[in-house]
């Protein structure tokens, strides 16, 4: 069976693994998912990730991050742009997540970047998700 929204599947796996307090989660790999995982790593939401080749598309093994008493670093994930309703933002309309405490992941002509980078570079694009 084909998957209609692989990015939503990735975000759901992260959310479910985080709620169940798993150390690692496995996600089917793609270039876009690798870029999103890299943003999560740079922003400090995950410990790290490895790409495991399995002879097909590969697997991203992501190490989730928790605080001292196993409190969650990722408190919320929301998919914004969906296959049935794409959401785009102009460079002047890029959203702030929780007043700057969270990040918006945006797909632009310069690749997948955070809302802060998009504002700095003056580009708009498709708003993929909010993470806080």
Curated annotation (Swiss-Prot):
Keyword Ribonucleoprotein among record annotations: yes
Acyltransferase is among the record's keywords: no
GO biological processes: translation
Pfam families in UniProt: Ribosomal_S8
Coiled coil: none
The entry's keywords: Ribonucleoprotein, Ribosomal protein, RNA-binding, rRNA-binding
Single GO MF descriptor: rRNA binding
Example of a GO cellular component annotation carried by this entry: ribonucleoprotein complex
Gene3D superfamilies the UniProt entry points to: 3.30.1370.30, 3.30.1490.10
InterPro entries membership: Ribosomal_uS8 (IPR000630), Ribosomal_uS8_CS (IPR047863), Ribosomal_uS8_sf (IPR035987)
Family matches, as HAMAP family: Ribosomal_uS8_B
Assembly information from the UniProt record: Part of the 30S ribosomal subunit. Contacts proteins S5 and S12.
Family: Belongs to the universal ribosomal protein uS8 family.
PANTHER family per record: 40S RIBOSOMAL PROTEIN S15A
Function: One of the primary rRNA binding proteins, it binds directly to 16S rRNA central domain where it helps coordinate assembly of the platform of the 30S subunit.
The protein, known as: Small ribosomal subunit protein uS8
Provenance organism: Alkaliphilus oremlandii (strain OhILAs)
């Amino acid at each position: 069976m084909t998957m209609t929204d692989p990015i939503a599947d990735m975000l759901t796996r992260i959310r479910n693994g985080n709620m169940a307090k798993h150390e690692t989660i496995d996600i089917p790999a793609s270039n876009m998912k690798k870029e999103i995982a890299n943003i999560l790593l740079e922003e400090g939401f995950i410990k790290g990730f490895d790409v495991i080749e399995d002879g097909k598309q590969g697997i991203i093994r992501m190490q989730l991050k928790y605080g001292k008493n196993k409190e969650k670093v990722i408190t919320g994930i929301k998919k914004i742009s969906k296959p049935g309703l794409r959401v785009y933002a102009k460079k002047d309309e890029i959203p702030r997540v929780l007043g700057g405490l969270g990040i918006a992941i945006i797909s632009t002509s310069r690749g997948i970047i955070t809302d802060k980078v998009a504002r700095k570079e003056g580009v708009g694009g498709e708003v993929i998700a909010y993470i806080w």
